[in-house]
């Protein structure tokens, strides 16, 4: 059963006439106009619009926390899945007015990454950001510039400007340098293993500062079996370095 149902209406600000786009639709979370106003970029679960975004095996139950994107044509009142074959979980998306591309913030394994999607053909590619966890981003309306800030396993937030044409990052402000000025952190390494059913479980381990491989240290094991992974951010409710 859906957690909620949502209705969407379009209000003509000149005549104040209301057009009902949909009523009490399940698994639909939000919508925004395309730059030309002819389509909607809709965020929801795979079960939205009668399940057209589902990509699961027969007998499996769809995960409503797996965020998906849809294009909704206002003339035909028909939706089409945009990220059905895209594995990461969609957190947020913006349809850029400058170049017509859709920029998607995703939960991708234990990373948070930005991807760009061409709505004309559905092709999705990763933006080469400089941090493991992108916290937030913003796009210029009239220039090929994306600003974002984020952090990684051993640094706090840094602010960058990203050239959409050249694909290059420019560090604007390093807050991490100020916050970690007097703090020593140990090394972080990836550590993956395969479960009994063959699934690769991705993990990592954190060494204490000034680690001596000839000494023995206590080990704390942290694991989480929920819908979202424990990501690689330095600053979280349970900072792994701490």
Regions found by a protein language model. Give the residues of each.
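A flexible loop/linker signature enriched in serine peptidases of the S9 family
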Residues: 1-8, 22-29, 43-70, 81-90, ...
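Short loop/turn segments that connect beta-strands within beta-propeller blades
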Residues: 12-16, 73-77, 118-122, 163-167
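Residue-level detector of Asp-centered blade-edge/turn motifs that repeat once per structural unit
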Residues: 35-36, 97-99, 141-142
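Hydrophobic beta-strand positions that form the internal "hydrophobic ladder"
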Residues: 37-40, 101-103, 146-147
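Serine-hydrolase catalytic core recognition
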Residues: 136-242
């Amino acid at each position: 059963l859906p957690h909620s149902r949502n209705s969407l209406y379009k209000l003509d600000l000149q005549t104040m006439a209301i057009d009902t786009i949909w009523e009490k639709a399940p698994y639909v979370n939000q919508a925004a106009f395309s730059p030309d106003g002819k389509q909607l970029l809709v965020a929801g679960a795979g079960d939205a619009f009668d399940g057209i975004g589902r990509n699961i095996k027969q007998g499996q139950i769809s995960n409503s926390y797996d965020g998906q994107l849809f294009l909704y044509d206002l003339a035909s009142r028909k939706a089409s899945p945009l990220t059905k074959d895209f594995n990461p979980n969609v957190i947020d998306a913006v349809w850029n007015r400058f170049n017509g591309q859709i920029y998607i913030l995703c939960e991708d394994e234990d990373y948070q990454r930005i991807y760009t999607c061409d709505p004309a053909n559905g092709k999705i590619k990763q933006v080469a950001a400089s941090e493991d966890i992108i916290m937030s981003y913003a796009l210029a309306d009239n220039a090929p510039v994306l600003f974002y800030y984020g952090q990684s396993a051993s640094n706090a937030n840094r602010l960058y400007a990203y050239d959409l044409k050249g694909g290059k990052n420019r560090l604007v402000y390093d807050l991490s340098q100020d916050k970690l000025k007097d703090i020593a952190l140990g090394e972080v390494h990836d550590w993956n293993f395969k479960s009994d059913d063959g699934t690769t479980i991705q993990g990592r381990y954190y060494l204490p500062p000034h680690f001596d491989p000839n000494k023995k240290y206590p080990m704390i094991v942290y694991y989480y079996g929920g819908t979202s992974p424990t990501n690689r951010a330095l600053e979280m409710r349970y900072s792994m370095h701490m």
